[in-house]
UniProtKB/Swiss-Prot annotation:
Keywords: Ribonucleoprotein, Ribosomal protein, RNA-binding, rRNA-binding. GO terms for molecular function: rRNA binding; structural constituent of ribosome. Belongs to the bacterial ribosomal protein bL21 family. The lineage of its organism: Bacteria, Pseudomonadati, Pseudomonadota, Alphaproteobacteria, Hyphomicrobiales. It comes from Rhizobium rhizogenes (strain K84 / ATCC BAA-868). The gene is rplU. It comes from the Bacteria. This protein binds to 23S rRNA in the presence of protein L20. InterPro entries: bL21-like, bL21-like_sf, Ribosomal_bL21. It holds the Pfam family Ribosomal_L21p. This is Large ribosomal subunit protein bL21. HAMAP family: Ribosomal_bL21. One of its GO terms (cellular component) is ribonucleoprotein complex. One of its GO terms (biological process) is translation. Disulfide bonds: none annotated.
Amino acid sequence: MFAVIKTGGKQYRVAANDVLTIEKLEVVAGDTVEFTEVLVIGEGADAAIGAPFVKGASVKAEVVEHNRGKKVIAFKKRRRQNSKRSRGHRQHHTVVRITDIVAAK
């Protein structure tokens, strides 16, 4: 069974026991989270498509850890001005393991 969920402004195709790196969630490692914004749920070629979400469907996941992504450098240089600026940024992420996909009843 698979599902397509929406979280953090992105969509992810998930199945049971998948490990995902998603945008940061304000939860403690070891907690359980439930994603109710399920866009598609199905098994094999049989799928239920929501408009926009599938009613009654949810995906449960366990928070594994919080980490940070690779550093992204934003560098600006103005030629012949002896002017340059470098700024770094690391995005915060949450790693989750999908435990259960619950279809609509």
